[in-house]
């Protein structure tokens, strides 16, 4: 998706609730297919999730059909993390990191596109960092989910999401340098640059025991 200036979209990595993200996403999908039971069970057992939706005038206690908002909007709203006072947790990262990852000077401007093209998993590594990068980049796509209800939204494109455990694993792999760089990468130090800035974002999520969402607009 291009913005109105025909430039590449701006990519954002933001903290989300990673403790219920997998269950919530699956519940939304099942509800769209006519089975509200998982969604209702989750709403009834998770007051923060229920309150998030209610604050956005989306009461689904009587079923998904009672809320006209899209699945992508419900995903963003429902997984918004709150502090002890019920206020939204803000991403405490600096503008330099945000700008560096926002519109990378290569290809489609997506920093994960560059990583997935020019880096890889070391052959001796027992864990594959690329699997997590793939999920963060395409986990909510039509190609992965079989529908475009998360990928397409009025505010942009939701690319992928990692739950809390996956985010912790990614932080550990990035910190240990568990990735390799292709010798022919076009931007000298490009992979290392993206990994360095991405690690800052991931560490913030891990510090707060949260997951990570990748979207563009």
PLM segments and residue spans:
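A cross-kingdom marker for long, charged
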Residues: 211-213, 217
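Intrinsically disordered or highly flexible coil/loop and linker segments, enriched in small
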Residues: 204-211
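Acidic (Asp/Glu-rich) sequence patches and key acidic residues
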Residues: 1-200, 204, 216
């Amino acid at each position: 998706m291009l913005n109105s200036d025909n430039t590449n979209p701006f990519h954002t990595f933001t903290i989300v609730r990673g403790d219920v993200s997998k269950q919530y996403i699956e519940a939304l999908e099942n509800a769209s297919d006519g089975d509200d039971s998982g969604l209702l069970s989750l709403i009834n057992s998770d007051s923060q999730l229920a309150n998030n939706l209610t604050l956005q005038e989306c009461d689904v206690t009587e079923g998904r059909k009672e809320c006209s908002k899209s699945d992508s909007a419900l995903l963003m709203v429902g997984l918004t993390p709150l502090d002890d006072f019920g206020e939204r947790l803000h991403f405490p990262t600096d503008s330099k990191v945000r700008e560096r990852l926002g519109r990378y000077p290569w290809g489609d401007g997506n920093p994960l596109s560059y990583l997935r093209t020019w880096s890889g998993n070391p052959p001796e590594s027992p864990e594959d960092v690329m699997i997590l990068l793939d999920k963060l980049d395409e986990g909510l796509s039509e190609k992965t989910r079989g529908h475009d209800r998360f990928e397409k939204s009025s505010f942009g494109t939701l690319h992928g999401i990692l739950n809390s455990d996956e985010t912790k694993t990614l932080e550990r792999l990035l910190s240990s340098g568990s990735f390799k760089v292709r010798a022919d990468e076009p931007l000298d130090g490009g992979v290392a640059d993206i990994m360095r800035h991405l690690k800052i974002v991931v560490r913030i999520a891990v510090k707060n025991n949260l997951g990570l969402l990748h979207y563009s607009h």
